[in-house]
Amino acid sequence: WGKPTVVYGGGLSNDQIQSTRDLFDIEDTNNVYETSVDANDLYNYLGIAGGDTSSLISSVMVQKQDAGKGVKVKIITEDNITKITSNQYANAAITAGVSDVEIDVASVSKVTGESALTGVYKALEANGETLDLDRTQVAQDELETTNEIAENNADNSNFDSGRLDQAMVEIKQELAEIKKNQGSAATAEQVEQVVTDALKKFNLSDIISQDDIDKLIEFAKKYQNTSAIDSQEVLEQLN
């Protein structure tokens, strides 16, 4: 990781790439490594088939940090990344196995931001890091699950997506603890209990619907079947 790595959305024109450079304050392109993502990357990292390169607009700048710094995400164009919060990006990146990086996200036009993680993965691989594709796909699932729940509760003044992000962290930590203590993944009943307890702890159990709770339970079951559950690094990044 000699230089920051910038990954542009494949749908950007040359002018838009220059505008994105300006958003990242890149004055001299010799100081960064630049690449871009396309529909093949969506398939390779996220398992999304039939993606459209021209729809990939959001871009990322990724810089490696010292060990122990954790994953820090800054959304530079908050008005244009309409669906995903910086905490949701960070949590999902940690699930995928990303550690100790600073990620800046920017988009020249309004986008959901759901594909930005693809750029993060591409940046890591460009710097010689290997990713577990089961984990990158579950991380995408996580992003979509939290985003869907937030969307479903957009008109609910009692809902707070920050508390949902905290509940997600709690769920991951508890599942890891169960596996460590009993030597095997949580049973279906234990998973339900972990999700119920986390939602109660962060005052969400009476706020989100049973349908949303079921989505979280489904995600938790998938999550504990990846190597993220055994990773000490994940637990350290989550703290």
Which ranges hold each PLM region?
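A cross-kingdom marker for long, charged
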Residues: 218-239
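Soluble oligomerization/assembly scaffold segments of membrane-associated complexes
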Residues: 88, 94-207, 211, 218
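N-terminal, leucine/charged-rich tether regions that mediate assembly and partner docking
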Residues: 1-104, 126-127
